[in-house]
């Protein structure tokens, strides 16, 4: 088992990574003390697979545990689902000492985290991510949110969990398309922060796709370490943390335009990352060779590298101008400057974006 710490002073928390961790009460004990009431929130896909196991482990800590099962899908990452959680907590007369456990992928983690941040002005929660995307990215760092029809993650809060427990054996039940979606975020870390990791991915992507345990532990651990370091230095995304949004400005536009859930988040980010690489090349920031390597690795990961055929420049810009990184009406993009480094650029000419998007 690997253990990584997110260093945020008195709000620091551990990330535990390994196999068969759901049977280890000690990993939950740092966040859940004896006698506390616990609500495990999951979805209709994950709950039948893992809820009983996780609940039994938490009960071993002498806690009362209940389950709230929600519908599955990005289309349910809404204020309506948030309100459903609130109603469950209020009807159950849960106090401020309740602990919420987010058992599922990124949607569950985001909406449960936002509910934990909001219920009685903040209660403890634990992230138990079950998809590759949530294990390497969304479960770490405290970003919580729900979507709005006009934009993704527009309603939310920064709110850190008390612990993250990552059991990579969950990936055995993950559909291939969902695994590929998670690979988009894995590749992202290599592009923005670690050239050697990118090279390792080029050499080992087939091992990851075959669910090789050693390769998975290394990749998940490396991603979590990079994110933990970034979050520790810039929790509220005022500086370097913005680099974690590589591909996301383009990607969120695809998700919003196509309808949440029709393109998976990682699929949209993959296409967005390729657009960002091509934009960087047009701006003289990135070599053609690096654009080719970035594009090929996404292709090998079974990810899209082009936009939906129904979208054009105008449909992209409509959504991109609502991005949270827009300042004073100016679009700001994360662009790679080489494999292993990136920067936020705010002066990309619209004719360049039009050329890249409509190519």
From Swiss-Prot:
Root EC class: lyase
Annotated EC: 4.2.3.4
Cofactor info, note text: Binds 1 divalent metal cation per subunit. Can use either Co(2+) or Zn(2+).
Residues forming coiled coils: none
InterPro entries for the chain: Dehydroquinate_synthase, DHQ_synth_AroB, DHQ_synth_fam, DHQS/DOIS_N, DHQS_C
Cofactor section: Co(2+); Zn(2+); NAD(+)
Disulfides per UniProt: none
Reactions performed catalytically: 7-phospho-2-dehydro-3-deoxy-D-arabino-heptonate = 3-dehydroquinate + phosphate
Residue numbers binding NAD(+): 72-77, 106-110, 130-131, 143, 152, 170-173
Binding residue positions for Zn(2+): 185, 248, 265
Entry-linked PANTHER family: 3-DEHYDROQUINATE SYNTHASE, 3-DEHYDROQUINATE SYNTHASE, CHLOROPLASTIC
Family designation: Belongs to the sugar phosphate cyclases superfamily. Dehydroquinate synthase family.
Function (record text): Catalyzes the conversion of 3-deoxy-D-arabino-heptulosonate 7-phosphate (DAHP) to dehydroquinate (DHQ).
The protein's name: 3-dehydroquinate synthase
Gene coding for it: aroB
